[in-house]
């Protein structure tokens, strides 16, 4: 058979560049389609967050009090002044909030979403107090970078027969979907820890239990966003890898495929 080769007693035929190109295109389309499901995970959170604008006054005083109650003020943590948010539209319009580790500022519009502030204070506690939270915080961005890198690795061609010995790169190619998922877990865990600490902090300020119950519901939806991102990233990368494996790995020739 033309262009075929033997390995370990089996006959194989390399895949053509056309096969690999088809795999690349299909893998890219499937990956994009899977990643397109992300808004379904974030919508429950964003929808409730907008509704919380109307009840902001119920949380604002307790949140501002929480910085002292937690001792974060002694660590230099501050709530960013309103003018600081003018160039950050998501935070300014109450669509998001975040804790900046570099300047120790909680970026939040306290006239709109103070309910989210306790969670951001939880991020500050992770960053400044304790070992596990700080470690997870440091692992977030490297983990997300690795997950993104796995998206590229998934599109690499598979030039070895399935039965050939595997090296480190082969292992990464074969498991890039799992690696992408695991790489996102530090973000999920750190977010969950921040919410847990935020709820505990809210109780210390004397916030009423019905309000805390509502807060926990919001934070659970926020965690769903991050958990969904991890699952979707793993599935998208894994699907791309399987497609490229199918289209680019050398094909074993069976006896019934050989014509004389």
Residue ranges and their predicted role:
Residues 130-138:
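Short, aromatic-rich amphipathic segments at membrane interfaces
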Residues 55-62, 72, 196-210:
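Cytosolic juxtamembrane segments of membrane proteins
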Residues 23, 28-114:
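Auxiliary, metal-adjacent structural segments of Zn-dependent hydrolase domains
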Residues 112-131:
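Active-site recognition of the HExxH zinc-binding catalytic motif
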Residues 18-27, 32, 36, 139-192, ...:
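Long, well-structured alpha-helical subdomains associated
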Residues 1-13:
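Short, compositionally biased, intrinsically disordered N-terminal export/targeting signals
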């Amino acid at each position: 058979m033309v262009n075929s080769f033997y390995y370990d007693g089996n006959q194989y035929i390399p895949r053509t560049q056309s096969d690999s190109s088809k795999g690349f295109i299909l893998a890219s389309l499937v990956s994009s389609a899977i990643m397109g499901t992300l808004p379904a995970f974030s919508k429950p959170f964003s929808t409730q967050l907008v509704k919380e604008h109307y009840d902001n006054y119920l949380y604002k005083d307790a949140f501002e009090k929480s910085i002292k109650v937690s001792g974060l003020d002694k660590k230099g943590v501050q709530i960013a002044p309103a003018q600081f948010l003018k160039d950050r539209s998501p935070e300014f319009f109450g669509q998001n909030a975040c804790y900046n580790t570099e300047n120790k500022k909680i970026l939040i519009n306290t006239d709109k979403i103070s309910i989210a502030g306790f969670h951001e204070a939880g991020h500050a506690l992770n960053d400044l107090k304790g070992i596990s939270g700080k470690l997870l915080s440091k692992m977030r961005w490297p983990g997300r970078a690795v997950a993104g890198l796995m998206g590229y690795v998934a599109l690499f061609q598979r030039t070895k027969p399935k039965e050939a010995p595997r090296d480190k790169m082969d292992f990464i190619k074969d498991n890039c979907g799992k690696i992408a998922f695991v790489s996102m877990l530090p973000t999920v865990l750190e977010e969950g820890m921040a919410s847990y600490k935020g709820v505990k902090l809210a109780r210390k300020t004397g916030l009423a239990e019905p309000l805390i119950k509502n807060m926990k519901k919001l934070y659970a939806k926020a965690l769903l966003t991050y958990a969904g991102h991890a699952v979707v990233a793993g599935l998208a990368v894994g699907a791309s890898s399987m497609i490229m494996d199918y289209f680019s790995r050398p094909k074993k020739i069976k006896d019934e495929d050989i014509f004389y």
